[in-house]
Swiss-Prot record:
Compartments, record wording: Cytoplasm; Nucleus; Synapse
UniProt free text on domains: The C-terminal PDZ-binding motif mediates interaction with the PDZ domains of DSH (Dishevelled) family proteins.
Cited Pfam families: Dapper
Region (Required for self-association): 85-149
Gene Ontology biological process terms, A to Z: dendrite morphogenesis; embryonic hindgut morphogenesis; embryonic morphogenesis; gastrulation with mouth forming second; negative regulation of canonical Wnt signaling pathway; negative regulation of G1/S transition of mitotic cell cycle; negative regulation of JNK cascade; negative regulation of transcription by RNA polymerase II
Stated name of the protein: Dapper homolog 1
InterPro entries the UniProt entry points to: Dapper
Length: 778
């Protein structure tokens, strides 16, 4: 030590020249190497002292146990004498240990004072060396690496030239006893022993750096202080010292505070030599830090592994979650008004989706919302699809409305999405309130519920000019419209924007009348096709014609456009059919306009399907949907049997959309149902194909899903069509109310044969080869 003290003041004298810098570098490297060696020796000494302490403690424990076993058979006076001797002996040992410790502390203090001058010089050397390395050798990374290493540095692999603060200055003022022992003041073997009374290690390594637990760098292993493994691990750089305070600052390499820390630790050592914490208290004090590190590490790993929730992506997998069921089969088109960023271009499809005059949205706002909102959205998507291809002329109004609706804020979307979740309860109460208004038309079986729908349908064109300016605001009030999935925005939101003929206000009122359908109305299913063609070709004029509520309304071009519309229906329905697959109610519309002789067809708005050569948006159904096909088939047979036997309209049970609210066993049947419709609609133009359509799609949901049974598109159809009604069809078709007991009086028949046309079989095979067997033979 003394040669160091004599030699190290010299580096301060040389000048600033190149030779001085070279000398500084050489001497600095030598000093840092010396400090590393010294640090290693101190760590080794601390480990040896710890092992010695452990040995002595074990020896004392063994002796105590032997004494206890020896005194078992002796008499009480003898045991009392032994206890007195043991107590006196322990007091002597404690006194001896305390004297040794005090002597060692005095020697340490002397060494610290002697080294106080060296600290400043070493710090200067470190600074100069680091500057030289940065300027000349450009090895700042190595410098940082050496700084981050544990200061014990027993197995450090750094080269001798890397002089870092943690390697030099920290080791100088570390509170270990190596300097004491180098001064030839080695004490008796008990110097490292502990005071027996408090079990506190008062060994040579007073430095808490060597008295606390060691944690491996990966955080998996902890070596508690008084243990042989700790004594070995303290010499290895592979472990981190669980310390706060001085040692952490040393590890960070804050050499500027080295002298202050040294003096503070010296004072602490002199003041607290008799009050050092026990190993257990040291562990408890250091354990929170290590546990915090471990918790943070685990949390970071968990956060890395956690996948973000993808709520906005449409999924093709079968899912019972209501929002995912809605988002899964949405169109690629994005509805601009619902808060889509203005940067997204509005394509031709969007323009057609915007063709709804503001009245449609107005009626939506005013109309009550009820649980089948998801179903209404999907059925509206059907209508939307048909209009994409067949209604370019009606896009002028929607195109004019588009710029306004583009400014709907995204917050509106989020708020409305929250409202959607709250509507389950709200919709039920609103549904009850609307049942009162919907029950009154029961008395007039011919045209009862049609009048409100017609009146609203007639008001829509007039409201167009008034509501254009309000289109951005209602987005907040339309929870059913605003799901954030761009991929499904068409099926969720734009469905409401299809045409003014949709009357959403009736959607809740419609449910009580699901069964109030005229059996004869089913025969007028072809009217739906004609009516839809009329809506596509003569929409502006028909829309504004007030019709009497009690009359059947026929469109002027009914007979002319019927065939034409059936052909074109193949175009718009295909994509709508597959996008409908998300919800049970959607599939009904396709079969509706072709089910001329089926009383159970649901009078849903007729939607056309694409021809085969234009169908490009097929989606493959996952194998789990085969169960849904089977269910749909079963229900179709059941409904077919009922309708074939009695040829009357079944009363649908209270609506419960399996996707939106109850994850029932039929939750995927809607997907296969819409699949059937989309495949069946354009199979052929004969009645056999019509028959198959009804069997697979409409009747299935009419019985099992609590869907609407009956072809008429009356007020009760507003629910199944997603809360929107074709006003022309409202005027066109009458209804006859059928009392609810019909459903219960008529037994449910579950085993029925189903005929499928050859074209239908081909189309079903195209989707799922395994499901054809189910559909035709089960």
């Amino acid at each position: 030590m003394k040669p160091d003290a004599a030699r190290e003041p010299e580096p301060l004298s040389p000048g600033r020249g190149a030779e001085a810098e070279g000398r500084w570098r050489e001497r600095g490297e030598a000093d840092t190497e010396r400090q590393r060696t010294r640090e290693r020796q101190e760590a080794t000494l601390a480990g040896l002292a710890e092992l010695g302490y452990l040995r002595q403690r074990q020896e004392l424990l063994v002796r105590g146990a032997l004494r206890c076993s020896g005194t078992v058979g002796t008499v009480a006076p003898r045991s009392g004498e032994l206890r007195g001797d043991a107590a006196q002996r322990s007091r002597l040992e404690e006194k001896f240990l305390e004297e040794n410790i005090l002597l060692l502390r005095r020697q340490l203090n002397c060494l610290r004072r002697r080294d106080a001058g060296l600290l400043n010089q070493l710090q200067e050397l470190d600074k100069q060396i680091s500057d030289l390395r940065l300027d000349v050798e450009k090895t700042s990374e190595e410098h940082l690496e050496t700084d981050s290493r544990p200061s014990s540095g027993f197995y450090e692999l750094s080269d001798g030239a890397s002089g870092s603060l943690s390697n030099s200055s920290n080791s100088v003022f570390s509170e270990c006893l190596s300097s004491c022992h180098s001064s030839t003041c080695f004490c008796s073997p008990l110097e490292a022993a502990l005071t027996i009374s408090d079990g506190c290690p008062k060994s040579a390594d007073v430095n808490p750096k060597y008295q606390c637990d060691l944690v491996s760098k990966n955080g998996n292993d902890v070596y508690r202080y008084p243990s042989p493994l700790h004594a070995v691990a303290v010499q290895s750089p592979m472990f981190l010292l669980c310390l706060t305070g001085n040692t952490l600052r040393e590890e960070e390499g804050l050499g500027s505070h080295a002298s202050d820390i040294c003096i503070g630790s010296e004072l602490n050592a002199t003041k607290t030599d008799n009050s050092l914490p026990s190993p257990s208290s040291l562990w408890s004090a250091s354990h929170p830090a290590s546990s915090k590190k471990m918790d943070g590490y685990i949390l970071s790993l968990v956060q890395k592994k956690t996948h973000p929730v993808r709520t906005n992506k449409p999924r093709t997998s079968v899912n019972a979650d209501p929002t995912k069921g809605l988002l899964r089969n949405g169109s690629v088109c994005v509805r601009a008004p619902s808060g889509v960023p203005p940067g997204s271009s509005v394509n031709f499809k969007n323009t057609k989706q915007m063709c709804l005059p503001a009245g449609g949205i107005t009626s939506l706002e005013n109309g009550p919302f009820s649980p089948p909102k998801q179903r209404s959205k999907d059925s509206k998507t059907d209508q939307l699809e048909s209009k994409r291809l067949a209604l370019p002329e009606s896009c002028s109004a929607g195109a004019a409305m588009e710029p306004q609706s583009k400014h709907v804020p995204k917050a509106a979307k989020a708020a409305s999405q929250e409202l959607t979740r709250c509507q389950a309860g709200l919709g039920e109460s609103m549904k009850e309130s609307n049942q009162a208004s919907a029950v009154s038309p029961k008395t007039s079986p011919g045209r009862g519920p049609v009048a409100p729908a017609e009146s609203k349908a007639l008001q829509l064109p007039k409201k167009m000019s008034q509501k254009n300016s309000l289109q951005a605001v209602p987005a907040l009030d339309r929870p059913a419209l605003d799901f954030k999935s761009e991929g499904s925005s068409q099926s969720l939101e734009e469905g409401h924007l299809v045409k003014a003929q949709f009357i959403p206000g009736q959607q809740a009122a419609a449910r009580p009348h699901r069964a109030h359908r005229n059996p004869g109305v089913a025969r007028s299913a072809t009217l739906k096709a004609r009516g839809q063609a009329a809506m596509e070709h003569g929409l502006p004029t028909v829309r504004e014609k007030p019709r009497a509520a009690g009359k059947k309304c026929r469109f002027p071009d009914d007979s002319d456009t019927n065939k034409k519309f059936r052909k074109t229906s193949a175009k718009g329905r295909r994509s709508g059919g597959l996008q409908d697959a998300g919800l049970p109610g959607r599939a009904l519309g396709t079969g509706g306009h072709r089910a001329g002789s089926r009383a159970h067809a649901h009078g849903r708005e007729p939607v056309v399907a694409k021809p085969k050569h234009k169908r490009t948006d097929y989606r493959r159904w996952k194998s789990s949907a085969e169960v849904s096909y089977e269910e749909a088939l079963r229900r179709a047979r059941r409904a077919r049997r009922e309708h074939g036997a009695a040829y009357r309209v079944a009363v649908a049970l209270p609506y419960a959309s399996p996707y939106a609210y109850v994850p029932s066993d039929s939750e995927y049947s809607a997907e296969c149902e819409s699949l059937f419709h989309s495949t069946v609609v354009d199979t052929s133009e004969d009645e056999q194909s019509n028959y198959t359509t009804n069997c697979f799609g409409d009747s299935e949901s009419s019985v099992s899903e609590g869907d609407f049974v009956g072809e008429s598109t009356t007020t009760s159809d507003s629910e199944e069509s997603g809360g929107l009604i074709w006003s022309q069809f409202v005027q066109t078709l009458p209804i006859q109310t059928v009392t609810a007991p019909d459903l219960h009086t008529r037994p449910t028949k579950t085993f029925v044969k189903i005929k499928a046309s050859h074209n239908l079989k081909k189309k079903i095979l195209r989707f799922r080869s395994g499901s054809l067997k189910l559909m035709t033979t089960v």
